[in-house]
Amino acid sequence: MKFVLLFGVLLVTLFSYSSAEMLDDFDQADEDELLSLIEKEEARKDCIPKHHECTSNKHGCCRGHLFKYKCQCTTVVTQSREETERCFCGTPPHHKAAELVVGFGKKIFG
């Protein structure tokens, strides 16, 4: 049972990694988006780093090692009993698992 679970996690990780790489390749290969690529390069300089607030710009998080960080939001109750939404750039759990498996694979296979 452990082997099946480990194999399943590895399969999902490899699929996530390959699909993310394919999407990046398609974005870069499209000649019509040359100007948008230049704009993206400028936007990368202004991207929001990990663990910083992204409440006002939910799609402006930087890229991590393998995946782009996602804006994760939570509801916070202030002392005056008002609910506000706070968001930060972070790595989702399934991306953390994928990075862990890829890291182990790189250590094992070179």
UniProtKB/Swiss-Prot annotation:
Pfam family, one: Toxin_35
Comment block on domains: The presence of a 'disulfide through disulfide knot' structurally defines this protein as a knottin.
Segments forming a coiled coil: none
One GO cellular component, as annotated: extracellular region
Keyword hit for Lipid biosynthesis: no
One Gene Ontology MF term: toxin activity
Disulphide bond pairs: 47-62, 54-71, 61-89, 73-87
Keyword terms: Disulfide bond, Knottin, Secreted, Signal, Toxin
Entry similarity comment: Belongs to the neurotoxin 19 (CSTX) family. 03 subfamily.
Listed InterPro entries: Spider_toxin_CSTX_knottin, Spider_toxin_CSTX_Knottin_CS
Superkingdom per UniProt: Eukaryota
Subcellular location: Secreted
Tissues where this protein is expressed: Expressed by the venom gland.
Protein name, entry field: U1-lycotoxin-Ls1dd
Residue ranges the record assigns to the propeptide: 21-44
